[in-house]
């Protein structure tokens, strides 16, 4: 792969980042800088502003272009940024109207993560939404910037940090390439996703553009982000009408949405594995949500359905114990339904299904025998529960009201006629039997 690093001689931050790169290259770490691992790196400097640069300014054989540059803002803050180039509307700062540049989610994510590692004290780290030119470079490219005033552009610590972010860039193959909708210029939610999950953004659109975006522009965002899997919508930054508008376009172009919550759940699993489990859950019941425990391995997913009466008897009121046991098991999802209620539907790999099913039944029976008066016989478990019997209470002359409450709470009461009624006198034993085929085979 040929990587061309581009800067402008009229851009102080670009000059200083390039100078920092040159200086760092004099003393590379053992094994060299990751940027050079299997790659050929070339350098070009142009005159004038890079936002107006022509295709002829770069290495014609390059596969990727990294532009090092200054960042300016009407509300200046010390910041290290990375962003794609493009214009969602009229080209006010270089490039062509309504044209986006090719870009690379994987490389931008790696730079963003390096920014977070090398950032000097007092600086923030951020994606920026897609903006300004150029837009017609023939290969993926993006801007690595130091902002936002002359003080930061000439700050050696900031420029060295940006240089290190470039030299130590090593894209991970385990990413989820995305396009993004909503948010402010500094792309707060997208930045958090890029730093804390496998999500890697290509083109990102400011809230102000979402309401009027066309299907053609969304298609361009997808195509020029070079292989995106899904779209992220910052719903808190958009109105209901804007959300509905973009959802409709995504449905038309066939790109699914993924939430920040789902990205955080994915941990080490592949995107295709996540989708397979999510879609299987959707077939079981509308609105079923999935939550992984431990590492989820690739492979065909399968459903494990615990008998609902067994599940309720074992874990109603003991949900945290159940979830902790799933953490120990790993390679399994629990599910929740309406209102976040824990469901007896679990998901695991097809090859693991039989073992998981047996383990969960044993776990349920053990939980019941540990916490309740119960008896296991053959393929049946019988649970005996003592509970207040209002019929017995009425028979003994206990009036409804506060005295009932005291008896239910396990306290004796004295009736107006002087008789004492103890809880045992108004308690009945209710036995519930749950049949579990094959229970006698589980140890």
From Swiss-Prot:
Q: Which domain of life is it from?
A: Archaea
- List the Pfam families hit by this protein, alphabetically: tRNA_deacylase
Name it. D-aminoacyl-tRNA deacylase
Gene that specifies this protein: dtdA
User: What cofactor is this protein dependent on?
Assistant: Zn(2+)
Matching NCBIfam families, A to Z?
PRK14866.1-3
Give the UniProt keywords, A-Z.
Answer: Hydrolase, Metal-binding, Zinc
Q: What class of enzyme is it?
A: hydrolase
Question: Which organism's genome codes for this protein?
Answer: Methanocorpusculum labreanum (strain ATCC 43576 / DSM 4855 / Z)
Taxonomy of origin reads: Archaea, Methanobacteriati, Methanobacteriota, Stenosarchaea group, Methanomicrobia
Family note: Belongs to the DtdA deacylase family.
Cofactor binding mode and count: Binds 2 Zn(2+) ions per subunit.
Subunit annotation: Monomer.
Q: Does the keyword Nucleus apply?
A: no
Q: Which function does this protein serve?
A: D-aminoacyl-tRNA deacylase with broad substrate specificity. By recycling D-aminoacyl-tRNA to D-amino acids and free tRNA molecules, this enzyme counteracts the toxicity associated with the formation of D-aminoacyl-tRNA entities in vivo.
């Amino acid at each position: 792969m040929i990587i061309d690093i581009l800067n402008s001689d009229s851009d102080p931050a670009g000059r200083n980042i390039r100078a920092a790169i040159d200086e760092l290259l004099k003393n590379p770490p053992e094994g060299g800088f990751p940027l050079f691992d299997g790659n050929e790196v070339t350098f070009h400097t142009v005159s004038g502003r890079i936002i107006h640069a022509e295709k002829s300014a770069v290495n014609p054989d390059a596969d990727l272009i990294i532009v090092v540059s200054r960042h300016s803002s009407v509300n200046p803050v010390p910041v290290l940024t990375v962003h794609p180039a493009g214009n969602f509307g009229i080209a006010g700062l270089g490039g062509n109207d309504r044209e986006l540049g090719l870009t690379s989610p994987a490389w931008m994510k790696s730079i963003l993560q390096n920014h977070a590692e090398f950032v000097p004290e007092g600086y923030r780290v951020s994606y920026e939404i897609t903006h300004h030119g150029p837009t017609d470079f023939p290969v993926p490219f993006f801007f690595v910037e130091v902002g936002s005033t002359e003080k930061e552009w000439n700050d050696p610590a900031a420029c060295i940090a940006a240089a290190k972010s470039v030299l130590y860039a090593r894209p991970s193959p385990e990413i989820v390439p995305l396009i993004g909708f909503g948010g402010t210029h500094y792309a707060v939610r997208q930045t958090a996703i890029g730093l804390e999950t496998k999500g890697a953004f290509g083109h990102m659109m400011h809230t102000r553009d979402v309401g009027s975006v066309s299907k053609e522009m969304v298609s361009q965002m997808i195509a020029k982000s070079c292989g995106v899997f899904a779209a992220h919508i910052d719903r808190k930054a958009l109105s209901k009408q804007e959300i509905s508008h973009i959802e409709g376009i995504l449905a038309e172009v066939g790109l699914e949405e993924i939430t920040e919550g789902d990205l955080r759940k994915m941990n080490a699993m592949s995107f295709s594995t996540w989708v397979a489990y999510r879609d299987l859950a959707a077939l079981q019941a509308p609105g079923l949500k999935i939550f992984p425990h431990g590492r989820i391995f690739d492979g065909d997913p399968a459903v494990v359905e615990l008998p609902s009466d067994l599940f309720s008897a074992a874990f109603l009121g003991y949900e945290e114990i159940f979830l902790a046991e799933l953490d120990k098991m790993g390679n399994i999802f629990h599910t929740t339904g309406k209102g976040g209620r824990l469901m007896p539907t679990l998901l695991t790999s097809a090859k693991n299904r039989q073992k998981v099913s047996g383990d969960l039944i044993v776990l349920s029976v053990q939980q019941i025998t540990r916490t309740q008066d119960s008896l296991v016989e053959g393929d049946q478990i019988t649970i005996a529960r003592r509970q207040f019997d209002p019929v017995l209470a009425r028979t003994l002359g206990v009036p409804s009201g506060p005295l009932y409450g005291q008896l239910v709470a396990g306290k004796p009461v004295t009736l107006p006629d002087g008789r004492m009624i103890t809880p045992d006198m108004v308690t009945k034993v209710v036995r519930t039997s749950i049949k579990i085929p094959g229970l006698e085979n589980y140890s």
